Amino acid sequence: MSSITNGEIREALAQALNAVPGLNIYRFPPEDVNPPCAFIAGFNITPLTFDGNRETKVDVTVVVSHKHVDQIVTLDAMLDSDGPWSVVDAIESATPPGMNFFVESIGGYRELTVADVAYYAADINVTVRT
């Protein structure tokens, strides 16, 4: 079984997100946000897979302003498979020691309320194998 901790996985994902210029990164679901941003939300862990590894499914939520509907364009760019604003590319390009990141699904576009303020948001579901 892997000796890599949940905290190390969270930190490695946060470091991967640093590749996106101007993106505010929250390692935990925040009480307040400054968009554009991404936060690392919940974990679902399979301690021992068929090949003896640990598999952690991580929800990463990306958030943009709700002030103008054209912010959906920014959200789209964050969810594209490549490009300077691609959160997906930042995650898939990361090579932290002892970890492999795989983007499993992207979507769930919605309005998200944080601290009584509405934002546009979507989810990136990441599988981390250690």
Regions found by a protein language model. Name each.
Residues 1-32, 44-130:
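Charged, amphipathic alpha-helical segments and their flanking helix caps
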